[in-house]
Amino acid sequence: MIWLEENMIKITFCFFKVIFILLLIVFSSAMLSIVERRLLAVFQNRYGPNRVGWMGSLQLCADMIKILFKEDWIPPFSRKFIFVLSPVIAFTSLLCVIPIIPFTSHFVIIDLNIGILFFLMMASLSVYAILFAGWSSNNKYALLGAMRACVQTLSYEVFLGLSLMGVVAQSGSFKISDIVNSQKYIWNVFPQFFGFLTFLIAGLAVCHRHPFDQPESEQELADGYHIEYSGMKFGLFFIGEYISIITVSSLIVTLFFGGWLGPWIPGCIWFILKIIFFIFLFILIRAALPRPRYDQVLLFGWKFCLPLTLFNLFLTAFLILV
């Protein structure tokens, strides 16, 4: 009790930091959906959303009103508790990774000693949301999407973890702030280029983004695992995808591109600019690449990404020993 009284100010400040960052990320994810639609329209030589507000600036408000007033329907043939739980897991799993990411040298909410392992754990947890959603919907298309997600996870989870082991070996720590500080003289993307490449590919798969959106491919599975969802439950899945994009982009920046480190301008501005670049890259990949066949995705993971990751790990170990 004495310890609680002495540290009440620190606890209160930390609590408000968590609330502020999480609300900022959720709002940014909602705005990102509009930004993506506008950018895709530019890439495809069309207008995009431009009717609500000036140049479509109020489209987000219109979308929120539409989702909030839609019928929140639960199919009578579904397993109701798991059906309701699935979008909550999808929304919170990668959102919980945000507090362990250092925004500057002085602004980090929770500086975990096992930050990398915590991210891998939460990335694995996000797959359960898809599995539960597909199974509890009692719909064949949803179940096929969930099965695709599970099998796809078996291929990318392996090289997702191994791609980070080279960074961990080079910095000598699982703590994300230590990894950023180890990049004062050279970013990890140069000695760990193969690790960065495979982590970027695995990050696309974690977010279920093009070209790894097999669990929800509209042309084949009619929206896949969330075919039975509507209203706010569908909104949680929708926003959860954009939260995962921001989370993975933040991790790429901190692990391979020096985080807040950079010349001339403040560190927080560097951090935000780097994140914006990778978010733009994710959108560009969606606009440019087609969706491959399901078996091609699995073969690509096992025959290209995994050997490349192992080669990067052995090369890193050799350079450290030499």
UniProtKB/Swiss-Prot annotation:
UniProt keyword Cell membrane present: yes
GO MF annotation terms: NADH dehydrogenase activity; oxidoreductase activity, acting on NAD(P)H, quinone or similar compound as acceptor; quinone binding
Membrane topology: Multi-pass membrane protein
Entries under InterPro entries matching the protein: NADH_UbQ_OxRdtase_su1/FPO, NADH_UbQ_OxRdtase_su1_CS
Keywords linked to the UniProt accession: Cell membrane, Membrane, NAD, Quinone, Translocase, Transmembrane, Transmembrane helix, Ubiquinone
Cellular component, GO, one term: plasma membrane
EC assignment: 7.1.1.-
Domain of life: Bacteria
TM spans (from-to): 15-35, 50-69, 81-101, 114-134, 149-169, 186-206, 237-257, 265-285, 302-322
Pfam families from the UniProt entry: NADHdh
One of the GO BP terms on file: aerobic respiration
Recorded family membership: Belongs to the complex I subunit 1 family.
Oligomeric and partner information: NDH-1 is composed of 13 different subunits. Subunits NuoA, H, J, K, L, M, N constitute the membrane sector of the complex.
Protein purpose: NDH-1 shuttles electrons from NADH, via FMN and iron-sulfur (Fe-S) centers, to quinones in the respiratory chain. The immediate electron acceptor for the enzyme in this species is believed to be ubiquinone. Couples the redox reaction to proton translocation (for every two electrons transferred, four hydrogen ions are translocated across the cytoplasmic membrane), and thus conserves the redox energy in a proton gradient. This subunit may bind ubiquinone.
Name used for this protein in its record: NADH-quinone oxidoreductase subunit H
Organism: Buchnera aphidicola subsp. Acyrthosiphon pisum (strain Tuc7)
Lineage of the organism: Bacteria, Pseudomonadati, Pseudomonadota, Gammaproteobacteria, Enterobacterales
Gene name as annotated: nuoH
